[in-house]
Amino acid sequence: MLWHNTIGSGPDLVLLHGWGFSSDIFETLVDKYKNQYRITLIDLPGHGRSDDVNGGINEWCNTIAELVPNNANVLGSSLGGLLAMKIASICRIKNLIVVGATPSLTCNDNWQYGMEVETFMKFADDLKQNYAKTLRRFVSLQTKDKTLMRRIFEIIDKYPPSSSALTQGLSILLETDYQELFKSLDIPKYTILGTLDM
């Protein structure tokens, strides 16, 4: 079962967090927008307070899709962005917003904007050796703000992801290429990238 919580009132906004985190990562966003939107927070499979879901991206997205209100705005961050792309293809949503996510995390012959596969595989190997240390290193790549970094570590430590969910999430990130799917979505799509995402 996936943990989810709905807060606020207004148009529906579903928030999908990234790899290794929980929906608590959105606490500042929720505080700011809960009076303008009815916000649905969902912990991804094996993350936060959610149980594991066996399988890959299709199984994860089918499970998440059951919690997405009709005509919702869906915002996904990183891995959550990739999942949001798939969910947009199986649910009726109003707008798709992806933050720090592209249709393919890794480079390939048709996509030059991702991470080199070798770099990704090194990260995956490090995860097998010491997932807590690797997750902390991953966070340190996201921000240099020490206060924010401490808060993110507190969120991760409060609800650590399962090792199987971390492995499944990395497999999804490595194997998924949604360039064609993303182009085919006939809804408004917004991509937000930071300096370190370029």
Residue ranges and their predicted role:
Residues L2-D51:
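Conserved HGGG/HGGXW glycine-rich cap/lid loop of the alpha/beta-hydrolase fold
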Residues V14-G18, S77, L193-G194:
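The conserved beta1-alpha1 loop
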Residues N58-A72:
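Conserved acidic catalytic loop of the alpha/beta-hydrolase fold
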Residues I90-Q129, A165-Q168:
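Flexible "cap/lid" loop of the alpha/beta hydrolase fold
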Residues G76-G80, A84:
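Gly/Ala-rich beta-loop-alpha elbow adjacent to hydrolase catalytic centers
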Residues K128-T176, E180-L181:
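Conserved alpha/beta-hydrolase catalytic His-Asp/Glu region
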Residues V74-G76, V99:
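Short beta-strand immediately N-terminal to the catalytic nucleophile in serine-hydrolase-like folds
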Residues S184-L185, T191-D197:
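Short beta-strand/loop motif that positions the catalytic acidic residue
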